[in-house]
Amino acid sequence: MCFATRRWFYLHLGCMMLINLVNADFEFQKGVLASISPGITKDIDLQCWKACSLTLIDLKELKIEHNVDAFWNFMLFLQKSQRPGHYNVFLNIAQDFWDMYVDCLLSRSHGMGRRQVMPPKYNFPQKITGGNLNVYLRE
């Protein structure tokens, strides 16, 4: 008898959980994704953050001001929008940003990015090919 009542209880519990899942408010999840822990902000590499933000404005050809604040205000607008298409665009841009940001951090930590950030010590000629001529320029 105990087995039957336990089974009946779990059946009701499972049905209630399914009903709650169907009626769930996913706006709460958007709010959780938007919150940034204060401890995380000091760990952000601002140079990579700014470079990736500005690069995404150019790559995605966004019709916003060409600065970091405008980009992130636009991202917040997309995230908090009630239109599902806006949230999908937000997720795509956020994924692209994250990929670029991680690549930037890895290249800087391995020294590849430092070569671009620091001023050049030596002035090596760069080869520019134009037609059949090979021209060497010093910048």
From Swiss-Prot:
Keywords: Amidation, Secreted, Signal. One of its GO terms (cellular component) is extracellular region. The active form requires C-terminal amidation and disulfide bond formation. The modification Methionine amide is found at M112. The keyword Secreted applies. It is found in: Secreted. Residues 1-24 form the signal peptide. The keyword Secreted applies. Its main location: secreted. It comes from the Eukaryota. Residues 113-139 form a propeptide. May be capable of activating GPR83 via the GNAQ signaling pathway. This is Protein FAM237B. The gene is FAM237B.
